[in-house]
Design a protein with these regions (language model features):
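Short amphipathic alpha-helical segments
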Residues: 1, 5, 61, 138-146
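Short terminal or interdomain "cap/linker" segment that borders an active site or interface and mediates
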Residues: 111-131, 136, 140, 144, ...
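Conserved short hydrophobic interaction patches
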Residues: 12, 72, 146-154
Length: 183
């Protein structure tokens, strides 16, 4: 993953729990330094180690830490780093999600060898099925946080009704069934 991701995780922990907790997370992770270049690609294991250490230090399940991080990514990092692109991507949550792949296409030109996840939206009566397809595994809780963060951004309450894993050869394909109501 790119340094931007690791820097965002660092930022979240520092803002919500303080510098001392970040130093504990860093020590517990075994990651030798916390100076990540945003545009540089780092081994995914570094990010997973930091998330695991955050779980250990903060006394929260890894899934809860990843969900919190997904919300932070949308509300803090992406908003600051890509605010104008986010604003242009949609006026409501579903419109935004439908444009997410195009948004990733624009960002892809900035990062070498970047293979973003894909999102597809289907209406299901009053609910929506949001397909998340990625080469990476283990990030479904992060996506839940992304969805909840987008809900906050667009003034919409997001309720995850179900998560269904679709069998794929490599990576992850998860269908999130969500209900959206005005907040």
């Amino acid at each position: 993953m790119y340094g931007l991701i690791n820097n965002s995780l660092k930022d979240m922990i520092q803002k919500q729990f303080g510098e001392e907790k970040w130093q504990e997370v860093l020590a517990a992770s075994g990651v030798p330094e916390d100076s990540f270049l945003s545009m540089r690609r780092y081994d995914d294991d570094i990010t997973y180690s930091l998330a695991g250490a955050a779980s250990e230090v903060l006394g929260a399940p890894v899934d809860a830490c990843l969900e919190m991080f997904g919300q932070h990514w949308v509300l803090e990092t992406a908003s600051k780093s890509y605010g104008m692109l986010l604003d242009a991507a949609g006026r409501d949550m579903i419109g935004f999600l439908r444009n997410m792949n195009g948004l990733h296409d624009r960002i892809t030109s900035t990062f070498l060898d970047y293979v973003p996840p894909e999102f597809h939206v289907e209406e299901d009566g009053a609910n929506f099925n949001i397909h998340y397809v990625s080469q990476r595994q283990g990030l479904n809780p992060f996506v839940v946080g992304l969805l909840k963060g987008l809900g906050t951004r667009f003034g919409t309450e997001v309720l995850i009704l179900d998560q269904t894993e679709v069998t794929v050869e490599k990576g992850t394909h998860t269908i999130f069934k969500v209900a959206l109501t005005p907040a």
